[in-house]
């Protein structure tokens, strides 16, 4: 990682974790086994805008559920991977499939399972309230 302006100028794709990145981290279980997550509406527009501007958008999350899947399918992300137990493998597969160099990718995560992915990409970022290890 060098000069931030130079690093960000190369970006062609954004890859995100979900819980703690698009949400406040709170999860409420439903009787059917699914979970309700509280999302910030402005994040949704950012996904749509990035897509319109030609960026690839990928979601890689350990969470799973029908509501989660429907939310990101609605916003037509390039790739959605839920229930993931090996994020770095999925990140590498996404980059290979899309012809991306790691320097062209932003990864946003908030917790320890995201660290390998953050080390892999050119622009690792985290929310202000991320785990201190991140």
Region locations from a protein language model:
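Acidic, Mg2+-coordinating phosphoryl-transfer loop and its flanking beta/alpha structural elements
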Residues: 106-134
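Non-catalytic pre-domain segments flanking phosphatase-related domains
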Residues: 1-16
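Short, acidic/turn-prone active-site loops that include or flank metal/cofactor-
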Residues: 83-88, 129-132
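Short, well-ordered beta-strand core segments
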Residues: 14, 57, 80, 124-126
């Amino acid at each position: 990682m060098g000069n931030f302006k130079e690093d960000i100028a190369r970006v062609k794709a954004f890859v995100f974790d979900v819980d703690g990145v698009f949400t406040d981290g709170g999860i409420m279980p439903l009787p059917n086994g699914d979970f309700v997550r509280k999302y910030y509406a402005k994040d949704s527009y950012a996904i749509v805008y990035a897509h319109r501007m030609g960026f690839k958008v990928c979601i890689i999350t350990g969470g799973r559920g029908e509501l989660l899947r429907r939310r990101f399918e609605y916003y037509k992300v390039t790739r959605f991977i839920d229930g993931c137990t090996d994020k770095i493998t999925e990140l590498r597969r996404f980059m290979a499939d899309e012809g991306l160099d790691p320097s062209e990718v932003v990864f946003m995560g908030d917790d320890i399972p995201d660290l390998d992915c953050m080390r892999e990409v050119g622009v690792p970022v985290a929310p202000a309230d991320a785990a201190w290890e991140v």
